[in-house]
Structures are given as C-alpha cells and as structure tokens.
Amino acid sequence: MRKMYLSAPLPFVGQKRMLAKEFMKVLEQYPDGTLFVDLFGGSGLLSHITKSLKPHSTVIYNDFDNYRFRMKHIPQTNQLLADIREMVGNSVPRHKIIKGELRERIFSRIEQEENSTGYVDFITLSSSILFSMKYKLSVQDMRKEALYNNIRKTGYPECTDYLEGLEIVSCDYKEVFNRNKDIPGVVFLVDPPYLSTDVGTYNMYWNMADYLDVLNVLKGHSYVYFTSNKSSILELCEWIGKNRDLGNPFENCTKVEFNAHMNYNSSYTDMMLYKKEAA
C-alpha cells in the first residue's frame, strides 16, 4: 500500500492539510474508478490524497504553479538551507531577526545559488528566513523584508512517490475543465486563490471577474470547493441570489480614475462612476 501524506512536502500558500481528514470523508461518497480533476492543483495534496484513497481512479493534477519542479530541486534546496543554517549557527536565537553582516552573507549565498544554477526555490526559502507566512519570489523583494532565523533543523524529505500515479497537466483551469466537463460522473476539485487574499505566489494574475468565472465550473457537476472566511465569495453569491433582477447598475456609466500613492511603494486607484438618468 502506498504511503499517504497529509501535508505537502514543501511549503505552499493555501495547502489544505488542515482539511485533509474532512476531505477524505467526502471522497468516501464516490466509487473507486471515478474521474477526479484537480483544477487548481497547487501543492498536489488534494490529488495525492484522492489517488491514495481511490487507486483505480484517474486523478488529473493541474500543476499550473510547477510544484513538481520545486520537488525535483529538493536536494539543491536542502543544500542551500544547510549552508544558511551553518552560517547562522547559534549566533541568532530561533525566530529572532538576522541583521548586519550575517544578513548580507545570506543574500550573497542565495545570489550565488541563483547565478550558478539558474534556480532558487524562493517559496521554500521564504518559509525559513522570512516572518511567518511572508513569501517573496526574488532576492530584490526579500531585501525589503526583515530576515528571521526560522531555518529548518533538517532538510526536506524528497518524497519521490508523492505525485505517483497522477495524470499531470499544466495549463489554464478553463482548458482542463473543458476537456473533462462532459465525462459522466466527473468530480471537480476546486481550490482557487481566495478572494481578498494575497495571490502573489501564484503564476497568474487574478481579478474579481476571474474569481467569479470559477463558479461556472460548479453548475451541473459534482465538486468539492474550497474557500475561507477571509474570502467574501459566499456572501457575494448569497446577495446576488437575493437580488437576481438588479443586473449591472454601472452599465453605460462614465468612469473616472485617479492614481493615489500611500507611500513610496504602495498605491491604489480611486474611481468615480456617474450616470445621469433621463428626466
């Protein structure tokens, strides 16, 4: 029997380890042999659990964020973390800020890794040297943050069997959906980036329309959909359900935009919309 992991081998924003056991209960409703399509594959945890419990099922894992590439580089990432761990030693207590010359040495080592190999797993690295749940994707962005000694005491296991048996694709979720939507009994696993949360580590830009487009895949299909109380998507859908005749109140209006700057690296766009109804 294959080993089943209840958390992803490498850090990933929004992996569903806290819901793993509840998700397993949902899977019990479906026979082995059902087609499962993980539209937003993320860390692959949902796909992995599904394949572990339903070994005769086809499980399609949409690895749009290239998680498998990060896993392939675990030995390289472990070596980089080991070098940083040795640099820090006992000079900085756990979870305290890394400052001064040591901070610069760490950045130099990361830059050396990127220049010599062409790759650094910045998400995994962020979890070891940035404040909890902060993730940056370049040395340039990391330099804007304080470094912390959150470095793992041991390397990450390679988990070579984690994605075993999955049918792996890497494309827009709409394309994956359209390929499989007419297959009888298909179950869609739908775990999009959450509305009103940071999507900076995802490989695509998301706006409000993108979040709402996802809801199209739910109608008429079996699904397991994930969200959180940090997202307002359920509240929005409930409101729309109660106000079905509203339509678009901003249709044919005029929009004026103004770029507002809060500080040197933060800005937003103020908008004014107006329309004069005929008398």
Language model: regions and residue ranges:
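S-adenosyl-L-methionine
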Residues: M1-L35, L45
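Short, surface-exposed basic-aromatic patches at helix termini and helix-loop junctions that form
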Residues: E28, T50-T58, K181-G185, N216, ...
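Class I S-adenosyl-L-methionine-dependent methyltransferase module
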Residues: S57-L163, K276-A279
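Well-ordered, non-membrane alpha-helical segments in soluble/globular domains
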Residues: Y148-K153, M204-V214
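Active-site segment flanking the S-adenosylmethionine/decSAM binding pocket
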Residues: G165-Y211
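Long, positively charged, glycine-interspersed low-complexity recognition regions
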Residues: M208-A279
